[in-house]
């Protein structure tokens, strides 16, 4: 797959999100299994790994630092701060002193002296974005981070932040099921020369077509609290993804690979970071690199699952308060 630019470096646009190995969903692999998966990810040609202070209260960063420390020059490393796990809940804090402290802690956990891209994980409503970005700019000047990113923001906030310091990347949720960045953000990123990094490009497993029984997931799994996975909405959403699977099979691929290929085709500045704790699922995701879709196929896929056909909101009311992305 042709490389794309990210914070001044040329990387494979199909990266790897390292949340799933410690955070958010069901059971998690042992450290040894997670370490083998991380090395397999690099062996498969991925050279962009994304993590965060939040994930497992720093455990994701620790695993990357422990199991990839001898391969640090083989991959582009992105992490995030300004959102941490406190007593089991996410706490947003964009104060400059917090950002500086969390960058230093991330460097220690990751066993590195530089993080290629560091995001403000969530916008703090109590702190002007200019102050948070100013702190990140100081970290760039100090050589601790290579570029500044923002996550789950609007185009308006991106423009404000970019006036303080060039923003290398924006990371928002984006997939066939979640199209909010199409309102303004993807285009604004392109205009500013900012990469757009899509997290949850398989919409938390939904777009694989393999996630059938939500009720059977552990009670701590975050999908229990998301409206699209509710007992009222999910049966209808399964009908949509089953149609996607039929299309994928007819075109010689899988629903997962087709969904990822669709996302990558939405712009030359777009990167995706699907995550998994499963080796077979990772290999399936890598299949997106060989999926070639013409304009008619892209349109057909996009018309099948979108903001008008998917049932339910992306987040519940509490979760929605933590993001600033535009709404349809």
Language-model-derived ranges and their functions:
Residues 25-26, 86-180, 184, 194-195:
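Glycine/proline-rich, positively charged
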Residues 1-75, 328:
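N-terminal binding-site loop/beta-alpha segment at the start of enzyme catalytic domains
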Residues 19-21, 52-54, 80-84, 120-123, ...:
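Active-site beta-loop-alpha junctions enriched in small/polar residues
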Residues 16, 49, 64, 77, ...:
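Conserved, mostly hydrophobic/aromatic
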Residues 7-25, 78-91, 114, 119:
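N-terminal small/glycine-rich loop or linker at the start of catalytic domains
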Residues 181-218, 254:
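Aromatic-lined glycan-binding groove of carbohydrate-active enzymes
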Residues 9-14, 45-48, 72-75, 112-116, ...:
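Short, well-ordered coil/turn segments that N-cap beta-strands
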Residues 191, 219-246, 250, 265, ...:
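Terminal-tail/helix-coil boundary detector
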């Amino acid at each position: 797959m042709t490389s794309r630019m990210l914070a001044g470096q040329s990387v494979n646009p199909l990266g790897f999100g390292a949340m799933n190995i410690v955070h958010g969903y069901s059971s998690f692999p042992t450290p040894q299994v997670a370490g083998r998966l991380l090395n397999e990810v690099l062996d498969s040609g991925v050279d962009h790994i994304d993590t965060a202070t939040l994930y497992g209260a720093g455990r994701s960063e620790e695993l990357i630092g422990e199991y990839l420390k001898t391969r640090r020059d083989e991959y582009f490393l992105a992490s995030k701060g300004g959102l941490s796990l406190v007593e089991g809940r996410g706490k947003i804090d964009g104060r400059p002193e917090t950002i500086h402290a969390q960058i230093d802690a991330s460097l220690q956990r990751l066993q590195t002296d530089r993080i290629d891209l560091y995001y403000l994980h969530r916008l703090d409503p109590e702190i002007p974005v200019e102050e948070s970005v100013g702190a990140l700019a100081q970290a760039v000047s100090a050589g601790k981070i290579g570029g500044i990113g923002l996550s789950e923001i609007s185009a308006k906030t991106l423009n404000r932040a970019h006036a303080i310091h060039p923003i290398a990347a924006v990371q928002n949720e984006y997939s066939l099921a979640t199209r909010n960045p199409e309102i303004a953000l993807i285009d604004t990123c392109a205009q500013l020369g900012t990469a757009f990094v899509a997290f949850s490009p398989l919409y938390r497993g939904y777009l694989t077509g393999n996630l059938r029984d939500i009720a059977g997931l552990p009670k701590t799994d975050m999908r229990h609290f998301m409206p699209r996975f509710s007992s009222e909405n999910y049966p209808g959403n399964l009908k949509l993804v089953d149609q996607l699977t039929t299309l994928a099979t007819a075109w010689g691929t899988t629903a997962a690979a087709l969904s990822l290929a669709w996302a990558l085709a939405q712009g030359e500045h777009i990167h995706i970071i699907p995550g998994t704790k499963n080796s077979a699922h990772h290999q399936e995701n890598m299949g997106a690199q060989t999926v070639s879709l013409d304009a008619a196929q892209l349109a057909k896929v996009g018309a099948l699952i979108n903001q008008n056909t998917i049932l339910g909101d992306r987040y519940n009311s509490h979760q929605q308060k933590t993001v600033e992305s535009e709404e349809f």
